[in-house]
Amino acid sequence: MNIFELRLKILGAIGRYKAKRRLKKLGYCGKGCKLGEPTLLSDYSKVLLYDGAEIDNGLTLISYTGRFIMKKNSSTAVGLTVVTGNHGREIGKWFNISAAEHSEDIEKDVVVEEDVWLGTNVTLLSGVKVGRGATVGAGAVVRTNVPPYSIVTGNPAKVVGFSLKPEEVIEHEKALYPEEERLPLDK
């Protein structure tokens, strides 16, 4: 082994060690999760990743009390931004976003359900729930809930289609989920 190969091997080992340390800081980390770097997290404990969840490089989480929850087998491309709060305004007071003022923020969890794909540079805003099997296109700003198996794009994100027909959703759910975990499709 030459010096170049040795250096690559050492750098790889350091990278794997750092990745494991980052995952241990999370509020919850299931099996087979990945969290790229760099990440900008106000609080690692506010991130919950379930089995097989993968976040590519460049996650930014802006949160004081809200959590970011990513469920099983969901993935992101680079540059995901998650904002769990909104700044309030009070009559008769100057607008101030200093750290001391964040106690007045309205914070809500952001939830990404199972089997979701989030494209490059997606922004998820406070209280949003991205439904199971949804696809969020690159650059989308999601400020309202996303229906299961829908495709959303734009700013603000809007439904532009569905990835599966209803009969395909039934087949897909049967293949992947136990009966008690399947979406109710009669609504």
Describe each model-derived feature in a short phrase.
Residues 18-52:
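Short linear elements at protein peripheries
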Residues 40-49, 54-128, 155, 162-164, ...:
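Flexible, glycine/small-residue-enriched loop-and-beta-strand segment within the central core
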